[in-house]
Amino acid sequence: MIDETLLEAEEKMERAIEHAKEEFGAIRTGRANAAMFSKIVIDYYGSPTPLPQMASIGVPEPRMVIIKPYDTSQTNAMEKAIRDSDLGVNPNNEGNQLRILLPQMTEERRREMIKVARHKGEEAKVAVRNVRRKAKEELDRLVKAGEVGEDDGRRAEKELDDLTQRFVGTVDELIKHKEAELLEV
């Protein structure tokens, strides 16, 4: 019972970390990457579809992105969605593809993005701690019901705390890495 609870908690914490990595990937740095377009959704014949499912996204240069739609009739819709997004970029429509030159980020914008990264990191830490809280409640319930001994319960709680600290440390590393990436000129 204890092993199952700890295993489930670890899986949920790993999912929280994966979600945080996705969120960090969508934060724009001074460098181009395909993940920054993952949150952009286009209305494709009535159904909202993420941009990466509708086009190939290439990064030929550090500050340039080329988006080649699979269906060229959607190029204008993609251009509008990118322009309306919070990325602050202006795509050039070349008919069969979109070319996006990323402007150099200002110091103010970098600081703003660092705040966003820290906020996303705190959200990930809260998610990890919530998983810990739920797992601890389950462990307490098992001890109270007499399904496991108190010593085993305390040992499992210590393992849970170690697990939580490890994942919170991982989030801290992700934040540090993203900050360094954002401060790089």
Swiss-Prot record:
Origin superkingdom: Bacteria
Q: Which CDD domains match?
A: RRF
Key words of the record? Cytoplasm, Protein biosynthesis
Cytoplasm keyword on record: yes
Main location group: cytoplasm
Q: Which Gene3D superfamilies match?
A: 3.30.1360.40, Ribosome-recycling factor
Q: Which InterPro entries match?
A: Ribosome_recyc_fac (IPR002661), Ribosome_recyc_fac_dom (IPR023584), RRF_sf (IPR036191)
- What GO molecular function annotation could you give as one example from this UniProt entry? ribosomal large subunit binding
The family database entries (Pfam families) matched by this protein are listed as: RRF
Q: Which GO terms describe its cellular component?
A: cytoplasm
Protein localization: Cytoplasm
Please list the coiled coil stretches.
Answer: none
GO terms for biological process, alphabetical? translational termination
The UniProt entry's sequence similarity note says:
Belongs to the RRF family.
Q: What's its job?
A: Responsible for the release of ribosomes from messenger RNA at the termination of protein biosynthesis. May increase the efficiency of translation by recycling ribosomes from one round of translation to another.
> HAMAP family from the xrefs?
RRF
PANTHER family for the chain = MITOCHONDRIAL RIBOSOME RECYCLING FACTOR PSEUDO 1 (PTHR20982:SF3), RIBOSOME RECYCLING FACTOR (PTHR20982)
**Protein name as catalogued:** Ribosome-recycling factor
Q: Which gene encodes it?
A: frr
